[in-house]
């Protein structure tokens, strides 16, 4: 493989990303491109080279953006440098996608020739178009018997509105059509532009950062103007932090050291940065002595949207959980956590996530990579409380809700959801959206598929909306959303009381109209799960002081009159009265043990 020279002319660089829905073959295509340009030898190829986390490979999703630099000798005899940034496809990581896209000039739009366009493809394509990308359409999996390239081309033109007549037909699995993709990248995608050239003050985009056990934080950068050299003192314009660059290089996907990176190039730097949180995706990097006049637009720190409590099943694992979370945060600055304690579950953490998939992935990584057993409380969103004294505050945890008398209004976040589904499932999906307080914005048909746009409260989506959508549509519907605004809602805090004691881990915010149904389901579920005690246990769902649902677990009863044969009835009555008095005393002082399984099942209640 030829060694990368640091001075590649701009006209010979192509920066591109691959936009695709989950499972449409994005990572496999990336593998083929690496293989056919000699980026890795045959023996070093593993399936999905760029998806380095086990979870990424298993779930078939890309979570962190990864990059690779390829050298390609085109049919015109020239050698081009191709920088591929592999972007996440899932809605939770939309900000990572937008930053990755802004580091490129073009995108490959990969669509499965048997499945067609999905909701997430749409969202990412519109982001690519917003970034003024040139698009090359690639139809993958054309070796499948179910592939219908002509129908899908029409669908792309109808749904997305771009010309797909010259789409490249490939099969990433067998390698068919890969050379055509490489030629299309070189001839159809534009070269990067640099206004100042390599002598201008340094201006570079921070595309991503990750933690390496040996080198500390590694930062992936795209140089816009100027030159990024070893030994230079750089400054992050968003956080104003300064660092000295220790090493500069590119990923092929192995690390290759270089002296400098010039305009249009994508590579990595290390600079003794201790935490990933200090490097914010989307920030502008410049030279400290000779800074650029203006930072790049569009930088915003990631805000957590969904919160939930994570508690160790065994209290002895608390310190292990703390250190595991610290390690994950090194690699994922959008994940936040703080300590909280619950009367029912002991010590744990209140964690903030970008969305539900993000929550699931963090929980799964904690359990798998650090071997922890965890209980997650019901997810909640960020509510805005407008108080009667004119102040405003955010509520992340329903258990911290202040007295209702002090609250003037509660505002909850709403989302704009796009759902694509085969039309035979439309009725069920419309009903699901209506049950979740959705407001229909539009409904359009594309061939045999319906495209729905709905406004929905995020509170109704975080529970189990996605699972319900998949089960109604037998897995065919796809779903994508953006958070739009906070609106006033008729929301109440529902508490669950067991034997008159509130259980903090089970309290949740619900809409007043749905409270009774939700409360009844919860009480019934707990009645099945809590074992019988020697005394009667009432389980109640309450809003403030009003009980809205109740179930009672009957007492285990010992037959105290068994030893009385015949004889006086008053003798039996005396024993029964004594038993009754004992049970009354027990109920007053007795503690109800709620097993861990009951918590886990009650919190999963909405998945059914």
From Swiss-Prot:
Enzyme class: hydrolase
The reaction(s) this protein catalyses: GTP + H2O = GDP + phosphate + H(+)
Single GO cellular component term: plasma membrane
UniProt-listed GO biological process terms: positive regulation of translation
Keywords: Cell inner membrane, Cell membrane, GTP-binding, Hydrolase, Membrane, Nucleotide-binding, Protein biosynthesis
Annotated signal peptide: none
UniProt membrane topology term: Peripheral membrane protein
Protein name: Elongation factor 4
Organism, scientific name: Rhizobium meliloti (strain 1021)
């Amino acid at each position: 493989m030829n060694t990368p020279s640091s001075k590649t002319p701009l006209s010979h660089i192509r920066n591109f990303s691959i936009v695709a829905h989950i499972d449409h073959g994005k990572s496999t295509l990336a593998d083929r491109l690496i293989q056919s340009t000699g980026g890795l030898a045959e023996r070093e190829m593993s399936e999905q080279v760029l998806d380095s986390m086990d979870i990424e490979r298993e779930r078939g999703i890309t979570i962190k953006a990864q990059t690779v630099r390829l050298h390609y000798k085109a049919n015109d005899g020239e050698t081009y440098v191709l920088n591929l940034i592999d972007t996440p496809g899932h809605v939770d990581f939309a900000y990572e996608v937008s930053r990755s896209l802004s580091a490129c000039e073009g995108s490959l739009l990969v669509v499965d020739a048997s499945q067609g366009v999905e909701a997430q493809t749409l969202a990412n394509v519109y982001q690519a178009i917003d970034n003024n990308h040139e698009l090359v359409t690639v139809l993958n999996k054309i070796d499948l018997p179910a592939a219908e390239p002509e129908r899908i081309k029409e669908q792309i033109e109808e749904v997305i509105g771009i010309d797909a007549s010259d789409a490249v037909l490939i099969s990433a699995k067998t390698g068919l059509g890969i050379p055509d993709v490489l030629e299309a990248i070189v001839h159809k995608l534009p070269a990067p532009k640099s206004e100042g050239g390599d002598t201008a003050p340094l201006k570079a985009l921070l595309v991503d950062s990750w933690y390496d056990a040996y080198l500390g934080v590694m930062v992936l950068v795209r140089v816009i103007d100027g030159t990024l050299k070893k030994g230079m003192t750089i400054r992050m314009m968003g956080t104003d932090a300064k660092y000295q660059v220790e090493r500069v290089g590119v990923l092929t996907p192995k690390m290759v050291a270089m002296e400098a990176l010039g305009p249009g190039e994508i590579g990595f730097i290390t600079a003794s940065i201790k935490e990933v949180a200090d490097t914010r995706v989307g920030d502008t990097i410049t030279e400290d002595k000779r800074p650029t006049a203006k930072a790049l637009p569009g930088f915003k720190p990631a805000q957590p949207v969904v919160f939930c409590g994570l508690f160790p099943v065994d209290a002895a694992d608390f310190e292990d959980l703390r250190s595991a979370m610290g390690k994950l945060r090194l690699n994922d600055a959008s994940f936040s956590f703080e300590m909280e304690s619950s009367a029912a579950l002991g010590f744990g953490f209140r964690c903030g996530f970008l969305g539900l998939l993000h929550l699931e992935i963090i929980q799964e990584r904690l359990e798998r990579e650090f071997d922890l057993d965890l209980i997650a409380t019901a997810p909640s969103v960020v509510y805005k409380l407008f108080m009667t004294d004119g102040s405003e505050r955010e509520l992340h945890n329903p258990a911290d809700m202040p007295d209702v008398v002090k609250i003037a209004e509660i505002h909850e976040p709403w989302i704009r959801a796009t759902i694509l589904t085969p039309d035979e499932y439309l009725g069920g999906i419309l009903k699901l959206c209506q049950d979740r307080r959705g407001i229909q914005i539009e409904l359009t048909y594309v061939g045999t598929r319906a495209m729905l746009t709905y406004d929905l409260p995020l509170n109704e989506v975080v529970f189990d909306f996605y699972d319900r959508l998949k089960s109604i549509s037998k897995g065919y519907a796809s779903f994508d959303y953006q958070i739009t605004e906070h609106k006033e809602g008729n929301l109440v805090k529902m508490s669950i009381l067991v034997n008159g004691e509130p259980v903090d881990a089970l309290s949740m915010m619900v809409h007043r109209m749905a409270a009774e149904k939700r409360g009844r389901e919860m009480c019934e579920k707990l009645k099945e799960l809590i074992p019988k005690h020697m005394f009667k246990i009432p389980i109640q769902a309450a809003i403030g002081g009003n009980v809205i649902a109740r179930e009672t677990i009957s007492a285990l009863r010992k037959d105290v009159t068994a030893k009385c044969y015949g004889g006086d009835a008053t003798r039996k009555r005396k024993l029964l009265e004594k038993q009754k008095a004992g049970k009354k005393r027990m109920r007053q002082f007795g503690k109800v043990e709620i097993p861990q399984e009951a918590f886990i099942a009650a919190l999963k209640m909405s998945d059914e």
